[in-house]
């Protein structure tokens, strides 16, 4: 793996509110969220707090697989929002959750290049001038598995395999491209569409037929009225509309 400088976008946790090492008390939620949700949930947290001012949110962003392992080891999260629904399903089967698993969105992927690059994002993966291509680590990042599948589907995996650099999660993958550690890469469409990044780069959306459906699922790990309220908001028309703004397909599609 290529190790870049500290990620501009959180590698381990970006906290909205005050994080703690114990289970969150009533009115405070500790959320483990897939890195592709960073910008969408930042906007969503503000929307949620306006309607639920009594609830404090502490949102941690990282790879879905790593969060699943942490929950198995007793990490004090109240809600788990994974980029791959299979992780929360496995936790639920093993009796490690307090609620049923729910689908909250379907993710999409895109090739991204910085505005300073001369590469065309639609052809960048095949460009012989490209030396490094960033993707998330397929071993524990669902978007990495989708990227790997897309490279196979596009018929170019073998020709680019030695160019691949692996990010710990999809946010670090984007940071590799931003920093120049990679010439281009495959990121979550939700990151490419973030308002703060629209002026920094260009993207080409990879056809959904090129990779398995990225069904994103969540589950309440520790039951509380606040956790149930957050789940209701996320699946509500306003929550789903916000996710759509960031390139996700709604849960019911």
Predicted regions and their residues:
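Bacterial N-terminal signal peptides that target proteins for export
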Residues: 1-9
